[in-house]
From Swiss-Prot:
It comes from Vibrio atlanticus (strain LGP32) (Vibrio splendidus (strain Mel32)). SUPFAM superfamilies: L28p-like. Binds the 23S rRNA. InterPro entries: Ribosomal_bL28/bL31-like_sf (IPR034704), Ribosomal_bL31 (IPR002150), Ribosomal_bL31_A (IPR027491), Ribosomal_bL31_sf (IPR042105). Its cofactor is Zn(2+). One of its GO terms (molecular function) is structural constituent of ribosome. Zn(2+) binds at C16, C18, C38, C41. Keywords: Metal-binding, Ribonucleoprotein, Ribosomal protein, RNA-binding, rRNA-binding, Zinc. This is Large ribosomal subunit protein bL31. The keyword Metal-binding applies.
Length: 72
């Protein structure tokens, strides 16, 4: 590798809004970053995920135009 052309690789601290803090190595210029969600508070990883099914495009079409096809 050429000397002097690569960014500095250093430890960076990440703090989540839930209070979880962890460190990782990165080329970021910042010493710390703030996260909105992490694996400790994200609904998918905590098992609190809800599936919201509002119906698809086909259901919406059938609701609007389904009566027209049954009149034949």
């Amino acid at each position: 590798m050429k000397v002097g052309i690569h960014p500095e690789y250093k430890a960076v601290s990440a703090t989540c809004s839930c209070g979880n803090t962890f460190e990782f190595n990165s080329t970021l210029a910042k010493e710390s970053i703030h996260l909105d969600v992490c694996d400790k508070c994200h609904p998918f990883y905590t098992g609190k995920q809800r599936i919201v099914d509002t119906g698809g495009r086909v259901d919406r079409f059938n609701k609007r135009f389904g009566a027209l096809s049954s009149k034949k």
